Regions:
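Soluble acyl-CoA-dependent acyltransferase catalytic core bearing the H(X)4D motif
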Residues: 1-7, 26-36, 45-52, 57-338
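Surface-exposed, glycine/proline- and aromatic-rich loop segments on solvent-exposed faces
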Residues: 42
Length: 338
């Protein structure tokens, strides 16, 4: 058994019916030109009947909500679904289906993940049929970057190569110590001593936190203004999608010497500013975003290795370049603490 890390437990304890703590990924694929009508059906059967047992973290089940243990009664039928949308299905129908599924809590009495293989999609304005993979996994098991890496590893590197194993049967590296169980040769007393020795570092971090409050780029939750977006969250989810060329984001990032994530935040900031202006409800103070920040330094594809930073979205600035630069200064300042 593995002891749940503090981060794992946090995601479990914060979860409510109206605030699910799972993450998801939607992947859209084009059928090969020579694919017959049963192409997706055969793919589904191949994934469902894989003889390779599920690997970590897909074989982990909660024990008393304190430990992870291997599920000895794993049943793929509880996790994998093959769905054919009613014809003629458009992208809006796919997004509606995923929105409904993403609103539902995962079952804590089995490994907390699902995979949906969805066929019968006609992409808007594009020729040919599409099919999709929708993955849903609890954040206590894995973070977004690790989840994306697992899915990428399960995909064929070329269009001509067949998929060999579903994502849940891939062998993953052992969890890093930050996410793992206490080593067997380590007693709770030794762990307590280690934590006690860490107290001076904690004190230094708290002192640095106080000093940094005088930095002009320092962001706190108390700086966030009230807005029409401050509403109680319901259990319903609504998914929308838009496609961009990644190269466009990279060109902007390179031109202004900022990160790709800064550009994404700037796009979100611009959209929020435009929406709030249209509603005549733009706050004078900038919105503050709660942004996940990866601490992953290796190529591992499991566990939670992340924290969160606060980012000034600079929605009070009309000039998009000034807005991007303000966002970059804010995120850079927040990241310095790690």
């Amino acid at each position: 058994m593995r002891v749940l890390s503090a981060v794992d437990q946090l995601f479990l304890r914060l979860e409510t019916r109206n605030q699910p703590m799972h993450i998801g990924g939607l992947f859209l694929f084009r059928l090969p030109d020579d694919a017959d009508a049963d192409f997706v059906g055969r793919l589904a059967e191949q994934m469902r009947t894989s003889q390779i047992p599920p690997s970590f973290p897909f074989n982990q089940i909660l024990h008393r909500e304190l430990f992870w243990q291997t599920d000895g009664r794993f049943d793929v039928e509880q996790h994998f679904r093959h769905i054919a949308l009613p014809k003629p299905a458009q992208m809006a129908d796919l997004l509606t289906y995923v929105s409904q599924e993403h609103s539902k809590l995962l079952n804590r009495h089995s490994p907390m993940w699902e995979c949906h293989l969805i066929e019968g999609i006609t992409a808007d304005g594009q020729a040919g049929q599409r099919f999709a993979l929708y993955f849903k996994i609890h954040h206590a098991l894995i973070d977004g970057i690790a989840g994306l890496r697992l899915v990428q590893k399960s995909l064929s590197p070329t269009a001509d190569e067949r998929v060999s194993l579903p994502a849940w049967s891939l062998m993953t590296r052992k969890r890093h110590l930050i996410d793992s169980v206490l080593p067997t040769d380590q007693s709770l007393l030794r762990v307590a001593k280690q934590q006690t020795r860490a107290l001076p570092a904690v004190g230094q971090a708290l002192l640095r936190n106080v000093v940094e409050r005088f930095d002009g780029d320092y962001v706190t939750t108390t700086q966030a203004p009230d807005s029409i977006l401050n509403q109680k969250v319901s259990s319903a989810r609504r998914l929308s999608a838009v496609s961009f060329e990644l190269s466009r984001f990279r060109r902007v990032a390179d031109a202004f010497g900022v990160s790709l994530n800064d550009v994404v935040l700037a796009v979100c900031s611009g959209a929020l500013r435009r929406y709030l202006l249209a509603q005549q409800a733009l706050p004078r103070k900038p919105l503050i975003a709660f942004v996940p920040y990866s601490l992953r330094t290796d190529n591992s594809a499991s566990g939670n290795q992340l924290t969160f930073i606060l980012a000034n979205l600079a929605t009070h600035l009309a000039d998009p370049v000034e807005r991007l630069q303000a966002i970059h200064a804010s995120t850079r300042n927040s990241k310095r603490r790690f």
